[in-house]
Amino acid sequence: MSSGGLLLLLGLLTLWAELTPVSSKDRPHFCHLPADTGPCKARFQAFYYHPVHRKCLEFIYGGCEGNANNFKTIDECKRTCAA
């Protein structure tokens, strides 16, 4: 296979992986962590996955520390955690 064909295949596989929803059994463990504003005092709009409600919700992030269940956009949260 030519390098162009391999590059096309890699691109298609990447697109497929990006568009495939995450099932609950494949959901990363951090999606089950609670929203954590962290100790800093900034006020950034952020999103986290709420496992009981099974959806991404908004929260205010302080700007430092916190945990991995923290996304800049609701779409990023949905792609990562929502099934």
Curated annotation (Swiss-Prot):
Expression by tissue: Expressed by the venom gland.
Secreted in keyword set: yes
A Pfam entry, by short name: Kunitz_BPTI
Signal peptide: 1-24
One term under GO cellular component: extracellular space
Listed SUPFAM superfamilies: BPTI-like
Transmembrane segments: none
Origin superkingdom: Eukaryota
Localization per record: Secreted
Cysteine disulfide links: C31-C81, C40-C64, C56-C77
Site label Reactive bond for trypsin, positions: K41, A42
Single GO MF descriptor: serine-type endopeptidase inhibitor activity
Keywords: Disulfide bond, Protease inhibitor, Secreted, Serine protease inhibitor, Signal
Residue span, BPTI/Kunitz inhibitor domain: 31-81
Similarity field: Belongs to the venom Kunitz-type family.
Function: Serine protease inhibitor.
Name recorded for this polypeptide: Kunitz-type serine protease inhibitor 28
The organism's taxonomic lineage, starting at the top: Eukaryota, Metazoa, Chordata, Craniata, Vertebrata
